[in-house]
Regions:
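Active-site-adjacent beta-strand/loop module that shapes the phosphate/pyrophosphate-binding cleft
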Residues: 73-95, 106, 112, 126-133
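A structural signal for short, well-ordered beta-strand segments
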Residues: 12, 68, 86-88
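A short coil-to-beta-strand element that immediately follows conserved catalytic motifs
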Residues: 62-70
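Nudix hydrolase/Nudix homology domain
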Residues: 101-167
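Short connector loops at helix/strand junctions that flank enzyme active sites
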Residues: 7, 15, 36, 63, ...
Length: 167
């Protein structure tokens, strides 16, 4: 039996000059706390497209996905919840905040992390990993070959692997 009952969220890890973009929430249970630009995946939307959309909606920045930095999964109140964090190369740096959702932003280095009121320790860990990535899950977009949006994320730089995998 197939089930699509999943709370699917995404975050944008945007690095510039060794610092990460963080935002301060303006509403909800996280009001006043800091974290990555984030949000939910809409119906019919890929998680990577959602990360780019949320970044643009919250901060006015466009970017391109480089890969996945980390993932959080849990079961809360009987519902599966998955949160994917994407490393994104900024294509613009002119921040224009959505003041309804975000009250402030900043570019932070690791040295500033202890003074930040984080949304969660998981959010802090994702930001830390983004600034010092050991290895990211690289995106292989094979949508053209498949005929619909289709991406594979692998911990490799060997693109030949994809040609050897039957889809």
């Amino acid at each position: 039996m197939r089930s699509n009952l999943c709370d699917l969220g995404v975050a944008a890890c945007v690095i510039h000059d060794g610092r990460i973009l963080l935002v301060q929430e303006a509403e909800g249970s996280h009001e006043g706390l800091w974290g990555l630009p984030k949000g939910f995946v809409e119906e019919g939307e890929s998680p990577s497209a959602a990360a780019i959309r949320e970044l643009e909606e919250e901060c006015g920045i466009t970017g391109e996905i480089l890969g996945i930095i980390g993932m959080r999964e849990c079961v809360r109140n009987g519902q599966t919840a998955v949160f994917l964090s994407y490393l994104i190369r900024p294509l613009s740096l002119d921040v224009s905040l959505n003041n309804k959702e975000i009250m402030n932003f900043g570019w932070y280095s690791i040295e500033n992390f202890e003074s930040i009121d984080w949304i969660s320790s998981t959010m802090q860990s994702l930001a830390l990993t983004s600034l010092a990535p050991n290895q990211i899950m690289k995106i292989f977009d094979i949508s053209e070959q498949i005929g619909y949006p289709y991406s594979v994320y692998l911990m490799t730089n060997n693109e030949k692997i994809l040609t050897e995998v039957s889809i």
